């Protein structure tokens, strides 16, 4: 006779009990997942939306992180030099692999509702790193002397997405229309 120990990763008080709320948590989780997965697919295959040249074409063609790290980083931000220095010179660079795997992992994990703790925290860290690189609070003085500033110097889509990811993790959103229940019953608690 074997005993099964149930190890819920979400406390009963944190679970969503409303069926409508469960469905909407799943919809938001899947939509956020598709946002990450689309970014991966467009950068990997050069689908012609945000990325013209595919990463998979090899040397000299697509470099998914170089453009953002060289030109998208706010030059007035306190960490501009750090982020500019991370830009890989080759498509095979470590930062490209790390970034692309993070996008793929976030997209697949969120869409399927797998490993929500790791997926949500990892995705939030990725988004907050991009927020730091963009430094929306730092105004940019252009060559002609005009000042360019973001619409909101503190809260932008990176903050909203990060907060939403943490909320989805806390309410166990992977359990609804996802494989979260199965995942939780087959993996150690720290992997939930």
Q: How would you name each of these model-derived features?
A:
Residues 1-105, 112-192:
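Extended, low-polarity transmembrane helix blocks
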């Amino acid at each position: 006779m074997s005993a099964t120990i149930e190890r819920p990763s979400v406390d009963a008080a944190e679970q969503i009990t409303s069926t409508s709320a469960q469905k909407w948590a799943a919809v938001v989780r899947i939509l956020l997942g598709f946002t990450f997965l689309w970014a991966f697919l467009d950068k990997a295959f050069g689908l012609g939306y945000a990325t013209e040249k595919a990463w998979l074409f090899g040397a000299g063609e697509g470099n998914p992180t170089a453009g953002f790290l060289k030109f998208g980083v706010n030059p007035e931000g306190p960490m501009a030099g750090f982020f500019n220095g991370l830009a890989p010179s080759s498509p095979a660079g470590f930062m490209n692999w790390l970034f692309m795997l993070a996008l793929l992992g976030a997209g697949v994990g969120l869409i399927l509702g797998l490993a929500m703790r790791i997926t949500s925290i990892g995705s939030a860290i990725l988004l907050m790193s991009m927020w730091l690189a963009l430094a929306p609070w730092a105004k940019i003085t252009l060559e002609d002397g005009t000042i360019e500033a973001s619409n909101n110097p503190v809260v932008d889509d990176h903050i909203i997405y990060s907060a939403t990811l943490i909320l989805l993790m806390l309410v166990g959103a992977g359990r609804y229309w996802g494989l979260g229940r199965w995942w939780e019953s087959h993996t150690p608690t720290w992997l939930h």
